[in-house]
């Protein structure tokens, strides 16, 4: 049953990856402000950021495929795993007994049975399976966190129905309810993975029954939750709304600071003193930052630099350094390479399961 359930999870996971691939490709050239420590950092692109989400789901897919490929059955070995009853049944015929487990495995569509066991299969199997689900949940949670933060910034939003109510008191609100639900369920699955680990660790000898009730709760509930999580992810990715103008506005407000290295190099090439220019940029950057933070003004760093004769650069010259594409490095190229070399071959090999959609009621 767990094997069949993992196959269903795999199908939905592939569809989430496929939708993310479309989103990444469509937005691979759209520059956006990157964040480290949630502080402005060197720009990336919207599509490149999506590949980070996708890569983690791809890692989950690899782990899932490995576990699926190594799943085995318990077989039939008796009350303590010694096959003692079969010795009696087959009059000690070892060759006949050796054929039993391979026949069971073939009948059930597995490659093999576990060579040794107690009364049950090792509960470590449940641990491996729930760890796969927990890994997917962790990837989904990270994705949902980023969407929630981006929605706060008004750069990217999850789908929002025309009749959806964001807040019972504040009618104007557009709360990221789907992403919040992903986070909530994901935390449950990640914690749920502790159950089979503890059960496996606390089994006595050939078997104790304290595994049973816990397993009957933790395993099916983990699968039910991850099924809902993947439906939510599929729905969110399929309906993501990007606001390029907001993204551009925020990027341009920070870009003058990030362009200072290029500005300084251009000024040095024109005959300026590097040490002097470095100190002036430091001082002017502090003035511009103070204007933005303390007085709520626009970033006027370029105007301050243009007014300083040490740089010998006009505002028009400085504006030429403001092309965001100059600061995104190989982001778009990385997206193309990642899709071509990593994602698309997997999607092509599994194209018969693609095309799923998910409808969510909020």
Which residues does each predicted region cover?
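Hydrophobic face of alpha-helices
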Residues: 3-6, 10-13, 17, 54, ...
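Short, well-ordered beta-strand elements within core beta-sheets of diverse protein domains
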Residues: 4-5, 48, 127-135, 262-270
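Catalytic-core signal marking the mid-to-C-terminal active-site face
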Residues: 165-362
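Internal glycine-rich alpha/beta core junctions
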Residues: 11-14, 18, 42-202
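Short glycine-/small-residue-rich flexible loop motifs, especially phosphate/cofactor-binding loops
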Residues: 21, 102, 264
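Amphipathic alpha-helical coiled-coil segments and their boundaries
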Residues: 2, 6, 50, 122, ...
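Long, non-coiled-coil amphipathic alpha-helical linker/lever segments
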Residues: 1-42, 109-125, 207-212
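Long, hydrophobic, amphipathic alpha-helical segments used as structural scaffolds
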Residues: 13, 17-31, 35, 61, ...
């Amino acid at each position: 049953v767990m094997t069949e359930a993992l196959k269903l999870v795999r199908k939905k996971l592939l569809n989430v990856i496929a939708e993310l691939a479309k989103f990444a490709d469509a937005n691979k050239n759209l520059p956006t402000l990157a964040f480290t420590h949630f502080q402005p950092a060197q720009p990336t692109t919207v599509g490149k950021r999506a590949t980070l989400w996708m890569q983690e789901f791809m890692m989950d897919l690899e782990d899932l495929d490995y576990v699926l490929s190594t799943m085995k059955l318990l077989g039939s070995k008796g009350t303590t795993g010694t096959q003692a009853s079969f010795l009696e049944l087959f009059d000690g015929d070892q060759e006949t007994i050796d054929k039993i487990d391979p026949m069971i495995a073939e009948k059930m569509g597995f490659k093999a049975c576990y060579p040794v066991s107690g009364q049950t299969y090792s509960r470590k199997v449940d641990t491996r399976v729930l760890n796969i689900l927990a890994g997917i949940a962790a990837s989904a949670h990270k994705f949902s966190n980023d969407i929630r933060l981006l929605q706060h910034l008004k750069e990217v939003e999850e789908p929002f129905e025309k009749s959806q109510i964001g807040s019972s008191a504040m009618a104007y609100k557009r709360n990221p309810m789907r992403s919040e639900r992903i986070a909530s369920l994901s935390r449950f699955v990640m914690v749920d993975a502790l159950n089979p680990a503890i059960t496996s660790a606390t089994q006595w000898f050939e078997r104790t029954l304290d595994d049973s009730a816990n397993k009957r709760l933790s395993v099916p509930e983990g699968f039910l939750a991850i099924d809902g999580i993947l439906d939510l992810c599929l729905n969110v990715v399929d309906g993501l709304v990007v606001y390029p103008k907001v993204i551009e506005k925020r990027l341009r407000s920070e870009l003058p600071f990030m362009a200072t290295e290029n500005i300084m190099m251009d000024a040095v090439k024109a005959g300026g003193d590097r040490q002097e220019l470095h100190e002036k940029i430091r001082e002017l950057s502090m003035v511009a930052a103070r204007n933005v933070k303390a007085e709520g003004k626009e970033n006027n760093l370029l105007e301050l630099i243009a007014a300083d004769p040490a740089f010998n650069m006009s505002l028009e010259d400085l504006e030429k350094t403001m092309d965001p594409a100059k600061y995104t490095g190989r982001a778009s190229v990385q997206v193309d390479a990642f899709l071509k070399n990593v994602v698309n071959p997997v999607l092509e090999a599994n194209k018969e399961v693609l095309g799923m959609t998910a409808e969510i009621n909020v």
